[in-house]
Amino acid sequence: MSTTFIIAFVCYALGALISIAFGVNYLLRSEFMPYHREAVGVDWQELDPRMRALLTGLMRVAAGGMLAEGISMLIMLQIPFRAGEIWAQYAVPLIGLVGALPTLYATILIRRRTGAHTPVLAGAAGIVLVVAGFILTKI
């Protein structure tokens, strides 16, 4: 692999690891994130048990998406991308952006509507890394 492909590989891997880190965090939490509390203005224990069950389920779904995105990217990087498969140069960023763009949109929307300190920068960083990786494969 050329130097630019190695840097692209690292950018993609870092983007994938951001997604995996958030996915693991959402999967293992027993209550919502501090920025979720900010958004709804209510502590976890004050919520109706059925609402807690619903929110926990939604967090698990989000975790699954983030984990699927990150793990898929890492597998694609390790096998077809490293082997120089042209289609992988498009599949890796596609997987990353399909997962990251809606997530970033949601964090921005929640921040604007509620004032909660959602992780906009982390989401944006993941997207920047994926886009940078794609650009580097085309140089």
Set out the residue ranges of the language-model regions.
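Membrane-interfacial loop-to-transmembrane alpha-helix junctions, especially the N-terminal start
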Residues: 35-36, 85-93
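Juxtamembrane helix-break-helix junctions at the cytosolic face
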Residues: 70-89
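Hydrophobic alpha-helical membrane segments
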Residues: 72, 89-107, 124-130
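Long, highly hydrophobic alpha-helical transmembrane signal-anchor segments
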Residues: 1-25
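Membrane-water interface at the C-terminal end of transmembrane alpha helices
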Residues: 128-139
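Membrane-helix boundary connector in multi-pass membrane proteins
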Residues: 102-121, 138-139
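Hydrophobic transmembrane helix segments
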Residues: 17-52, 56-58, 71
